[in-house]
């Protein structure tokens, strides 16, 4: 298929998801409920967020793992004492429309807490969990079985020591559902390769409309941006 003379590649099957990174941080506070709601009004299909486990085992949403000038770890602060909203509050936004949530975690404990929160909200099927530790993801896939959120490995090409084809094969072998990389890493050839192994291709950090369009033409299964209005503008310029 071609868009304006440019060869485009298909997604794995579902339409591409346009995700607002942190809500609408150019207009509202980053990772705020106001920003998440605004992103939906601006046309985002869901959100890309970062989750942390609080001292009382609640998943809270914030880009940074520490808070304040003393750089206290969010894991040492109860959720009620944190300015970061809980994941449960995000999952309640437009719940009847099932917006996708792609959440980054750093450890298995946080991953398990995300799964509990998603299950409690009836949102397991619209949750993608990203993690840079493939061993954590592989263990979770083995432990949790098929009724779980999608598990996405987040790492650059340079981390694929044996090359992308071997890496995609490994993801399939251990039951990890996809790969996340930033703009500048994905190509149409790479999305086709990962799709050949039935792995999702998650595109991150597209700053401009042009970049979002390129992501879609490459065949990524989701594209994220800090600017949700640009996501909607890019969608409007594509067939």
Name each model feature, range by range.
Residues 1-239:
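Phosphate-group recognition and catalysis centered on beta-loop-alpha active-site segments
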């Amino acid at each position: 298929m071609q868009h304006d003379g440019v060869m485009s590649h298909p997604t794995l099957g579902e339409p591409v998801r346009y995700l607002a990174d942190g809500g609408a941080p150019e207009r509202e506070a980053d990772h705020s409920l106001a920003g998440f709601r605004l992103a939906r009004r601006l046309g985002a299909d869901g959100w890309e967020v970062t989750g942390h486990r609080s001292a009382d085992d609640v998943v809270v949403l914030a880009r940074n793992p520490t808070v304040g000038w003393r750089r206290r770890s969010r894991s040492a602060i109860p959720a009620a004492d944190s300015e970061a909203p809980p994941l449960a509050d995000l999952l309640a936004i437009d719940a009847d429309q099932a917006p996708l949530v792609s959440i980054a975690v750093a450890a298995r404990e946080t991953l398990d807490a995300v799964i509990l929160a998603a299950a409690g909200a009836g949102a397991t099927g619209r949750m993608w969990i990203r993690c840079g530790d493939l061993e954590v993801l592989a263990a979770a896939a083995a432990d949790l079985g098929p009724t779980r959120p999608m598990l996405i490995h987040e790492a650059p090409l340079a981390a694929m020591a044996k090359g992308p084809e071997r890496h995609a094969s490994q993801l399939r072998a251990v039951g990890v559902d996809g790969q996340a990389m930033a703009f500048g890493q994905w190509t149409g050839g790479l999305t086709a390769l990962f799709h050949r192994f039935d792995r999702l291709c998650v595109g991150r950090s597209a700053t401009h409309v042009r970049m979002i369009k390129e992501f879609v033409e490459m065949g990524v299964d989701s594209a994220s941006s800090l600017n949700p209005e640009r996501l909607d503008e890019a969608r409007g310029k594509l067939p």
